[in-house]
Structures are given as structure tokens and as C-alpha cells.
């Protein structure tokens, strides 16, 4: 099983916010996690939220193997085997029916992928979420053109050195993208390590 130190640090704080969007009275809350990484997040969420039926996804085969190992290690009956999913491709290739998901989760992907991946994520959410469903994203963001603190500014510079198409998105740009996909930015939650959770709800 792969272990990412950042995932170990942030999985608890993220869960505290995420659980507010998983109705404990619902028999099954169907969720897709896009860019699941090592599998630490989905394993942690699934253990804490037994009615969350989670479908992880990853492009990287080593990460998919790690996700499967976490599922096996914790005997997680509410997590499916990981799917190969490229969010830059049409939502019709993702393997879900329209309006079939309560929740889509995306942690630390937006700033380290090309814009087509984020655009595809939002388009997919607009089609696949049920009315009232939530797109839940986590990562560093600038707000109305202002990126703070200096460590995030430096991080953004380093990202663009690695790939000019990468970089930290502004919340206003994501809000505009959400609007075109039939969603709205409902809430923004400040998190440890200068990150944020953004909650987009489908109309």
C-alpha cells in the first residue's frame, strides 16, 4: 500500500467537512472519488461513514493497486474496486448514468492537472450528480485574484515550472465554470496548511 504523508495529515480534517454532506439517515449515499491517489482518503472516509458507497478512480496503475490493497486490508464492503478514469474525457466514458450520484469528491487534483481535467470534472459533475448533489473539492485556491500566503505563491510558481499548464485556480473561475455546468459554489471552508474545501451544489 502506498502512503502519502499529506493524505495522512489531511484525511481527518477533510472528513470533518465531508461528513456534513453525507446524510446519516440515507441508506446509501453513492459517491465517486476522482483522482483517488493512494487510496488513503477513500479508506478513511468509508470506515467512518458506513452508508457511503464509494467508487474510487485513478489513471495511474500503481495507485489503483494501492487503492485495491487498502480495500482488502480494511475489508471495505462499501468501496468498489478502482476504475480507470480520465476526467479530461467525456463524462459518457466514466461508466455512470446521468443523475446517479449524490456526491463527487476530488482532492488535490485541480492544481496539478491541465485545465481540461478540471473542466471535464465540472462537466461530469453537472451531468452525473443528482439534482441537489454535491461536488466536493479540496486543495489550494486563490480567492478573487488574491493568493495567500507566500508559501502558496511559491508553490504556484514551482507548479508552473514543472508544467506551464498546471497551477492554482481562482475560486471565481471555478464558480464561473460551475455555473456553466448547472452548479453553484455554496460554501468555502478554510482548512489547515492554507487549503480550502469548496462545496458546489447542482441545481
From Swiss-Prot:
It holds the Pfam family DUF938. InterPro entries: DUF938, SAM-dependent_MTases_sf. Coiled coil: none annotated. Signal peptide: none annotated. SUPFAM superfamilies: S-adenosyl-L-methionine-dependent methyltransferases. Belongs to the UPF0585 family. PANTHER family: METHYLTRANSFERASE-LIKE 26, UPF0585 PROTEIN CG18661. This is Methyltransferase-like 26. The lineage of its organism: Eukaryota, Metazoa, Chordata, Craniata, Vertebrata.
